[in-house]
Design a protein with these regions (language model features):
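Active-site catalytic pocket residues across diverse enzymes, especially alpha/beta-hydrolases
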Residues: 41, 226, 230, 334
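Flexible, glycine-/basic-rich loop-and-beta segments that form/coincide
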Residues: 389-494
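Short acidic (Asp/Glu) and glycine-rich catalytic loops that position anionic groups and cofactors
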Residues: 166, 260-264, 304-310, 345-354, ...
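Non-catalytic, mostly N-terminal accessory regions of nucleic-acid modification and defense proteins
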Residues: 1-196, 263-271, 382-385, 409-416, ...
Length: 673
């Protein structure tokens, strides 16, 4: 409905000089909503007012009492319509506010979050209010005419509203809450892929949620996409949004489309789930990247402490970036599979961080591990850079499902679509590239085909690659490798003084403290010992020589080693009092062993030839499976799709140099004449 959107957009002409261009939406959007609701309520307005007047002084639940009469999940009890407000120029401000206050609370909430009264006051101050009211009062946004024929359907109105949003985002410097339509089209195309029952069965009803709804773009495009294939299907839309104005836009968009506005909630999803008992057939989101979750930390940690009963049981990412928490939230909201039926699917946009951030055992790695172990990860699509309005970084579409078909179980499909776009004629913020319909269709085909792809278009240069992996491919074990501590021992004056000043020394029993002090005093300050056993024997002998009968205990000997030892790679491996070789924390290393590979075989092949004195720390085990080596996960697109390009041959390089030299000499001769 571009024509309808253009008609409404023309009203912005009245705002020039009074408002900045990026402020137009504060006027145009709420007035569009106001006029649409005014029009659709017109046929039942008088009946609603009669019922309201009869009970207005009684304690009635007006929502339950009046919505059946209005025919919508909202109503208006005021005596004003927008054309009626336009009839009284002197009272336009007060009458308009009275009209707004006459709406049911769910609609007033939208205008409140828009800050609409403040906008009305500014319009009045700039002498634009009456002109704007008059212009919108003349705009026909009726759903049906007097004969019952459609004028502007909910679908038409929704498309027009979306077109207006797109126009406003084109002139806005921000656009953070707006996911580009081409990205959404790809997301919902893949999300619905294979669900023939949804796309073809008349009367089918499904639910869809977005926990970071923004202006509702993902939800509205999903509904439109579904209706292209099945206009008799119903997709019930749910969303939650933190920012007040974007929440108001989203709720208004859903209202205009005939959705239940109660399904759009305002608030931080991480802090509180506003749809606590609702699960979804589909979910899609573009959560913020690199935004810390500190404001919701208390609530998140309480949820995590609930274990499986909470939303964040698998793990918590670093406080600096909460995007993986939104994925966990969505996983907790998937429609469960019951006796092979039901289940849910998720599409979510992430940057590169959730693919590989976090070491083995860390929060991010544990979240990936949980998703992979439960076989929820279906596919990840790498998108081109420069696809979003507010960032040019690489982004990825994750597709998650608890109802994977048999042929996809235990498998993960990676699609490299970073070469599948074309440059836009005009940049929108940082967005320089977009998906064409052909790009989307080809990526969706690669998803549906579920097999290796290596495609290149000779004319455009666009490329598409895909590979199928076993889910275990993305697991590894972090095995700790130790090497011996090698020290020489010498009782220098400085070392002895430091030993005697240590609090641990002063806390030794009197007999042991005196024995240690006497023994180190008897040592030759110039003597150097490169073997720990020899040094301990000398120390014990010195104590005995001083008349101390009781052998020095483990604690004094440990203190002596701490202060009288200096690292020396030429010394023998240092042992403790039990004869066990001590490891050197400074030489400690880790090897990342592919999951399933025998760690001893790996050690013999990759470590022992380089460090013959090294050994595996078998006390470093995974908390879950109890085996040596902590389990970690990562999904490295660069490695999986890396293509080795051999260096040019010496002959080729030599020929190029000779060619350049010849050109240079020809140029010199030309200059010399």
């Amino acid at each position: 409905m571009a024509k309808l959107a253009d008609l409404i957009w023309k009203n912005a002409e009245l705002l020039r000089g009074a408002f900045k261009e990026n402020e137009y939406r504060k006027v145009i959007l709420p007035f569009t909503i106001l006029r649409r609701l005014d029009c659709v309520l017109a046929p039942t307005r008088e009946a609603v007012r009669i019922k309201y007047e009869a009970v207005k002084d009684k304690n009635y639940d007006l929502d339950k009492f009046l919505t059946p009469t209005s025919g919508y999940p909202f109503f208006n009890t005021s005596k004003f319509t927008l054309p009626g407000v336009a009839e009284s120029p002197d009272d336009v401000r007060d009458n308009l506010e009275a009209m707004i206050n006459g709406f049911s609370q769910n609609v007033r909430d939208i205008f409140e979050k828009f800050g609409f009264i403040a906008t009305i006051d500014k319009l009045a101050e700039k002498n634009r209010l009456f002109l704007v009211v008059q212009r919108f009062a003349e705009t026909d946004l009726r759903a049906i005419d007097e004969k019952g024929k459609p004028v502007v359907t909910n679908h038409d109105m929704g498309q027009a509203f979306e077109e207006l949003l797109r126009k406003f985002n084109d002139v806005s410097p921000a656009g953070e809450q707006y996911t580009p339509r081409d990205v959404i089209e790809l997301m919902v195309t893949v999300l619905f892929e294979g669900d023939d029952d949804v796309l073809s069965v008349p009367g089918v009803v499904r639910t869809m949620g977005d926990p970071t709804a923004g202006t509702g773009g993902i939800l509205s495009v999903a509904e439109e996409h579904l209706h292209k294939f099945n206009d008799r299907a119903t997709l019930k839309l749910f969303g939650q949004e933190l920012e007040d104005e974007t929440y108001a836009i989203c709720k208004a968009d859903m209202l205009i489309r005939g959705q239940d506005p109660a399904n759009i909630a305002n608030g931080d999803t991480l802090e509180k789930d506003k749809h606590p008992h609702q699960t979804f057939d589909y979910q899609a989101a573009n959560p913020p990247y690199g935004v810390e979750w500190k404001p919701a930390e208390d609530a998140v940690r309480k949820e995590h402490a609930k274990g499986a009963a909470g939303r964040f049981a698998p793990g918590l990412p670093a406080i600096r970036d909460g995007q993986m928490l939104f994925s966990l939230h969505m996983l907790s909201k998937m429609q469960p599979v019951v006796k092979g039926k039901g289940g849910g699917r998720i599409g979510v946009v992430h940057n590169g961080s959730p693919l590989f951030t976090g070491d083995a055992g860390g929060g991010e790695s544990e979240i990936r591990r949980w998703i992979l172990e439960h076989d929820y990860l279906d596919c990840i699509v790498a998108m081109p850079t420069d696809m979003f309005y507010n960032t040019n970084i690489a982004t990825y579409l994750w597709f998650i499902s608890n109802r994977k078909p048999p042929e996809r179980k235990g498998k993960v499909l990676l699609i490299d679509a970073s070469g599948m776009s074309h440059l836009m004629k005009k940049n929108l913020g940082k967005k320089r590239r977009e998906f064409s319909e052909d790009c989307i269709a080809r990526i969706a085909k690669a998803y549906a085909g579920f097999k290796a792809v290596n495609w290149r278009d000779a004319n455009s240069g666009r490329t598409l690659k895909a590979k199928v992996f076993d889910r275990e491919h993305f697991f590894y074990r972090k095995v700790t490798i130790e090497r011996p501590l090698r020290c020489r021992f010498q009782a220098t004056a400085e070392a002895v003084a430091a030993l005697l000043a240590d609090k641990a020394y002063t806390k030794l029993p009197d007999e042991q403290r005196d024995a240690l002090k006497t023994a180190v005093a008897k040592l030759d300050a110039a003597a150097i010992y490169t073997d720990a056993d020899t040094f301990r024997a000398v120390l014990q002998k010195a104590a005995k020589k001083a008349g101390i009968k009781k052998v020095l205990g483990a604690k004094p000997l440990e203190l002596a080693r701490k202060y009288l030892a200096t690292r020396d790679k030429t010394a023998s491996p240092t042992t403790n009092e039990k004869g066990e070789v001590l490891s050197d924390s400074e030489l400690r290393d880790a090897e990342y062993v592919q999951f399933g590979e025998d760690i001893d075989s790996y050690f013999d092949r990759e470590v022992a030839p380089h460090w013959p004195d090294a050994w595996i720390n078998r006390d470093s085990k995974d908390d879950k499976d109890g085996l040596v080596g902590v389990v970690g996960t990562e999904i490295n697109f660069n490695r999986e799709f890396y293509v080795y390009t051999p260096p040019r041959s010496r002959e080729t390089i030599r020929a190029e140099i000779e060619t350049m030299e010849k050109r240079f000499m020809d140029m010199l001769r030309g200059v010399a004449g």
